[in-house]
């Protein structure tokens, strides 16, 4: 979902779909669909933890997860077990075609470390940042061209995952729609500094909120 709007208002998901097919990919599926898929799982996990008096952190940002595992290993058990939207979409594709090779494209370099983690079954096989996919397109003489925004896989809530606080917005909306209106409070940490501060409070038992949404 972070791809929309990054290259001008006229460059849509359909623009990207046409371009990647020209360079040799079979098709494009929006990672925001994975946001829709994982929101349900994330919400149920949050609700269970909340009702048990436990605190949790989100798991969709690999930079944040790496920060916890490296610098706050005692908090690793608090990381949500819900897979990232990237992984959810990859698993869906591979369920339909076990021989498919899946490639994630986005702005986050840390996605490469998530791909390299072989413990995550069914995850994307490769991750490319924007510079890399644009270099491939340039080598193939392919350009992103304006196209009508007709190609959408995800809802607006799946697209929220591309913004800080988006996971929280999606999960709380899901809870509202399913009439599970618990008074859950979330610390929205955007950037490494805010993530470190939130984790320090959690580590010391001083985090007032129930969950941390971390986007490092």
Region roles according to the model:
Residues 1-216:
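Iron-sulfur-associated redox domains of electron-transfer enzymes in respiratory
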């Amino acid at each position: 979902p972070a791809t929309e709007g990054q290259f001008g208002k006229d460059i849509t998901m359909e623009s990207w779909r046409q371009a990647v097919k020209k360079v040799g990919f079979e098709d494009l599926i929006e990672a925001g669909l994975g946001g829709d898929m994982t929101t349900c799982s994330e919400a149920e996990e949050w609700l269970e933890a909340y009702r048990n008096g436990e605190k949790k952190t989100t798991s969709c940002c690999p930079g944040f997860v790496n920060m916890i595992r490296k610098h706050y290993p005692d908090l690793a058990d608090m990381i949500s077990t819900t897979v990232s939207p990237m992984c959810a979409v990859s698993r869906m594709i591979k369920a339909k075609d076990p021989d498919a090779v899946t490639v994630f494209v986005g702005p986050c370099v840390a996605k490469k470390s998530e791909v390299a983690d072989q413990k995550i079954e069914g995850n994307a096989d490769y991750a490319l940042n924007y510079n890399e996919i644009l270099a491939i397109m340039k080598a193939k003489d392919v350009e992103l061209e304006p196209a009508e925004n007709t190609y959408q896989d995800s809802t607006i809530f799946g697209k929220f995952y591309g913004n800080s606080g988006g996971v929280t917005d999606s999960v709380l909306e899901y809870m509202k729609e399913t009439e599970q209106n618990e008074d859950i409070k979330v610390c929205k940490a955007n950037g490494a500094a805010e993530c470190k501060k939130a984790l320090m409070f959690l580590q010391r038992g001083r985090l007032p909120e129930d969950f941390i949404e971390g986007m490092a």
